[in-house]
């Protein structure tokens, strides 16, 4: 039989549909899920679909069978949550591998029954994203904290994939990806286990875009996500969940144009309605899916939430005889990424006459910046982050980070700093260059970056074996790499040695390891000139010559260098140093230097250097005449003397140094300044602005309820429109917390030592639901807004929620849930609260929740206020209204009126539908 790699070129492959909603149709009980084996395991098991591979294999096999009968070519094993991380919620960690094995084994048995030479069937071992994230902090007060690490996730997924391969998987499907660092760890695990078993299975990747900004939950654009994947051997890339077909189609069209992989799509059966149900039928979805097929934008098509064998049968008929998508060529330019894509081609340039150039910011380097070293030593991370932020604002397209200092724990500091800047969207948008002479530091840094970063550096200094080992690590963790022109003999200082080492390294990397040459950046060693030693005078010229040779003879490779090394002899004379750098880059860029580690702010304009100075500096840089270095030293002394005299005169005259012009937003009213600061996450001016606001508002709490909450509401609106994305919202929340902390002493004074908490909120994901990422985000945002949060976690029974609410005397309760059964559990929780005499506000949120469901099902069974909250950024503002004695009655009245209107509209609509059904029943039967 043909394998999947052959068949995908010939036809559109049909992937199966939803598993969870199909399982629900069997109306399984808690006893069904437990079976005899897990009868005594504590907690609730219902909803843990993966355990049915062990306790009800008949149900799982039946679902597989029905999808195969419908025409599916690929059966997705029921193994989405077969990782220890996920099964820990059910106390079944030790059964995770067995579940994975059994899920794949059952699928293998059914696929083998249906396979024929003309239509072989394939098993996709399903790896879900887990409910943890490697890229985001669960703790608002500690942006560097992580709930799970790369290594922990890698270990758990290795165990899962090991079971999947042993069970008979033909493909590994990593799906519903919301965090690219999670995905990278999972790809790493899949490849590692394939090597163990001696197989090379195709890896399918399917991401989920979570907001209208078109980004993943962790903040990456689709293009940045593709860049992060580009070093890996990926079979297909696509999307699933979150969207129905019409909403997903523009993203799939884009992937089909730019992604050099087979393209997959398995959308939901439309978007959930207000009752958490999917309205699309197999018949209504068929023409939508036919558009994907007929327009040639997919190779693999299937279904996600709400789809069934009936849907898949329609898709299979639509795809029959249709041509699959033709995969586009791999890009001929380098892809790097942070939250955004950096494409190194003719579109990346500075205002000089070079075709392309990437500024690599040099100031986050403890070896090159005394200020940065001092800040890291003193744990002054906020100011250190400010240095990175300024570099990006000044034009750095990549940020170099180096923590190599004898008195620092370089590994810990590297991880801490990378995790911290990951929480700063204006920095995290650009790729990182992880710079260290210690390989364990580089490895630790690579495991912190969801984007495609650059390793600085590797070399042949310790021989080929170590060089190749390091290069394999670079490829394993999905990075590009700087290769120093350094070998076993030493550092290359001549043109001949530079090109000899570069050529040798290039062929080892490209021919022996299969590294993409576009991911190689050579550093032919920028060395100091004008040192007084004649043998150093030609260093810049030979670097430029080597750059040109590399550009012409090593296809795809790039060239970089630490530019400031060139002018080391002139340290203390900033003007001359920057002029030397400008002239050097002007000539080096012309012949192919496309990266440079520089101070982006200090870049000079070549055309604005005075003619006499320019000629002299070019004489030195290009080594055009003897004695030029001495002349430049004299010029440098003259310029420094004039600068020193000007400083002394200014000091003697008492003239203050000119202040930089204030940004435009600082000229607005204090309310607008505070709103802007929240939106952009700027903490620098909070103290003076809040001091000014306190002069204007009667009470400190009025500042919170006024301009600060106005700012938070604006952020909520922008997020809802897709004009802000989640990491920006989280940063806004941290800024809000900083503002509240400034106000706290004033609030305490006004309350004469009373509590400054805005209120105590209990949060829980309801019984039967293990999804908590959304809830965790709400907790972060709420705590930043000065609320005390009691987080009960996931799968929390109604009885526990009620008991804790009474014990802690909470002011409001937040209920979260992602899956449809959670809607019923929320109703039950409200009923239990009613029985217990609670009347505190309930906030409801989650993917399947809706205002209509609250109006129809929850509000009628509870006498306290209940509100549906659309997204995390709105909770604080809603709570503020509920807990304000003046606002609350008006707010509750508004809700009651709105719910009554929604109920009336719904019942009128249902009556019309019922009348139509009755009319059809009563039609005249003439045949």
Model-flagged regions — what are they?
Residues 1-927:
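Domain-level signal for soluble alpha/beta catalytic cores
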